[in-house]
């Protein structure tokens, strides 16, 4: 009698076959994340190129916004839907467009198309970094870092307009359109005086400063190879020894600041932490603006400036500037509301 001991070979199902094909070693890795990333990124980019080339914003904003109408790269945009569309997804087959592609473009359907596919594409790219990190056997901090720009995109383009009356108040997808949105944020929300914006600026600029300092310090402390320390030729990717001196770098900054990083892991984590945290904080701030939460208000200065013509601070001047932005932008940006402001309500500085 013969007894065979071992594991029963399981039948390979369709999932295993697809998994093998998706994770096959190729020039451009696909993976499961690619099923989300590649179609969504293709559709978002294609929708943006189509909109900026051919589609007008006349029916939604009363503006020209395409190359076909004479705009250039800095002034083209895929603009937000009309205010009257509310928060409709504006599906091509929905009640607004009723399957008419031309009408769908006219009412702003391309914006929701680009925004939603763009968000899913960014999420797919983050999942791609998770997937490849798992396959290669490294930690997933790249994906964690990429969550910061995703948070900014989702909060600005999706959550903020969801808190307002319609998609109309989101940024349009274009350079000048984004600039207009920044002015809108300042005028209607006093965004620059928001503490979450301050943390975002500190994170982004602080990250840039850390990057510049770190790169310069490494270049300063390269080990000599032969006659000199060569920036581009000396390093071999497979070499076992260090290519720069952490001890020398630590001594250098200790003499300048009196304090320096002595641990490479902590140093690089800090370079990750500063910009990522800053972007996350600014995203939280935008969610607050979606709920119309206010920034810092210094009411005592406003009251005194109103009572005393000779008293003015940079804060009160900025408040007047914000009022001017609102008074100018509301009629220009929302012509359908038919705003009319008499001269006496328009803001004037105390110097006037």
From Swiss-Prot:
- Sites binding Fe cation sit at 214, 268
Q: Has the keyword Transferase been applied to this entry? A: no
In Swiss-Prot or TrEMBL terms, this protein is called Photosystem II D2 protein
Annotated positions binding chlorophyll a PD2: 197
**Which residue pairs form cystines in this protein?**
none
Alphabetically ordered keywords of this record? Chlorophyll, Chromophore, Electron transport, Iron, Magnesium, Membrane, Metal-binding, Oxidoreductase, Photosynthesis, Photosystem II, Thylakoid, Transmembrane, Transmembrane helix, Transport
One GO term under biological process is: photosynthetic electron transport in photosystem II
Q: According to its UniProt record, where is this protein located?
A: Cellular thylakoid membrane
Q: What is its EC number?
A: 1.10.3.9
The record's cofactor note says: The D1/D2 heterodimer binds P680, chlorophylls that are the primary electron donor of PSII, and subsequent electron acceptors. It shares a non-heme iron and each subunit binds pheophytin, quinone, additional chlorophylls, carotenoids and lipids. There is also a Cl(-1) ion associated with D1 and D2, which is required for oxygen evolution. The PSII complex binds additional chlorophylls, carotenoids and specific lipids.
Which residues are involved in binding chlorophyll a ChlzD2?
Answer: 117
- Gene name per UniProt: psbD1
Q: Provide the function of this protein.
A: Photosystem II (PSII) is a light-driven water:plastoquinone oxidoreductase that uses light energy to abstract electrons from H(2)O, generating O(2) and a proton gradient subsequently used for ATP formation. It consists of a core antenna complex that captures photons, and an electron transfer chain that converts photonic excitation into a charge separation. The D1/D2 (PsbA/PsbD) reaction center heterodimer binds P680, the primary electron donor of PSII as well as several subsequent electron acceptors. D2 is needed for assembly of a stable PSII complex.
Additional remarks: 2 of the reaction center chlorophylls (ChlD1 and ChlD2) are entirely coordinated by water.
Residues recorded as binding pheophytin a, renumbered to this chain, are 129, 142
Show the GO MF annotations: chlorophyll binding; electron transporter, transferring electrons within the cyclic electron transport pathway of photosynthesis activity; iron ion binding; oxygen evolving activity
The record's subunit annotation is: PSII is composed of 1 copy each of membrane proteins PsbA, PsbB, PsbC, PsbD, PsbE, PsbF, PsbH, PsbI, PsbJ, PsbK, PsbL, PsbM, PsbT, PsbX, PsbY, PsbZ, Psb30/Ycf12, peripheral proteins PsbO, CyanoQ (PsbQ), PsbU, PsbV and a large number of cofactors. It forms dimeric complexes.
């Amino acid at each position: 009698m013969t007894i065979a001991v071992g594991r029963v070979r399981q039948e390979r199902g369709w999932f295993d076959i697809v998994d093998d094909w998706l994770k096959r070693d190729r020039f451009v890795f696909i993976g499961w994340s690619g099923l989300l990333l590649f179609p969504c990124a293709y559709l978002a980019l294609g929708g943006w190129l189509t909109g900026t080339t051919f589609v007008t914003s006349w029916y939604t904003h009363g503006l020209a916004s395409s190359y076909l109408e004479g705009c250039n790269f800095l002034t083209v945009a895929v603009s937000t839907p009309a205010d009257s569309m509310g928060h409709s997804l504006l599906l091509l087959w929905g009640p607004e467009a009723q399957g008419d592609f031309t009408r769908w473009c006219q009412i702003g359907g391309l914006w929701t198309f680009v925004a939603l596919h763009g968000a899913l594409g960014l999420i797919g790219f983050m999942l791609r970094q998770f997937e490849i990190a798992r396959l290669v056997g490294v930690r997933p901090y790249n994906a964690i870092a990429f969550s910061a720009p995703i948070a900014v995109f989702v909060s600005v383009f999706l959550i903020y307009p969801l808190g307002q009356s319609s998609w109309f108040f989101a940024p349009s997808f274009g350079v000048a359109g984004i600039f207009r949105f920044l002015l809108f944020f300042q005028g209607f929300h006093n965004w620059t005086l928001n503490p979450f914006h301050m943390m975002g600026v500190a994170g982004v600029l602080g990250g840039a400063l850390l990057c510049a300092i770190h790169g310069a310090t490494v270049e300063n402390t390269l080990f000599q190879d032969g006659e000199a320390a060569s920036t581009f030729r000396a390093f071999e990717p497979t070499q076992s020894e260090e290519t720069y001196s952490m001890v020398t770098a630590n001594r250098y900054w200790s003499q300048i600041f009196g304090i320096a990083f002595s641990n490479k892991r902590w140093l690089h984590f800090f370079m990750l932490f500063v910009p990522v945290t800053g972007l996350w904080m600014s995203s939280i701030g935008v969610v607050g603006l979606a709920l119309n939460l206010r920034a810092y208000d210094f009411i005592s200065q406003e009251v005194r400036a109103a009572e005393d013509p000779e008293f003015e601070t940079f804060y009160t001047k900025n408040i007047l500037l914000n009022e001017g932005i609102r008074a100018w932008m509301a009629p220009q940006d929302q012509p359908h509301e038919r705003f009319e402001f008499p001269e006496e309500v328009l803001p004037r500085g105390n110097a006037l």
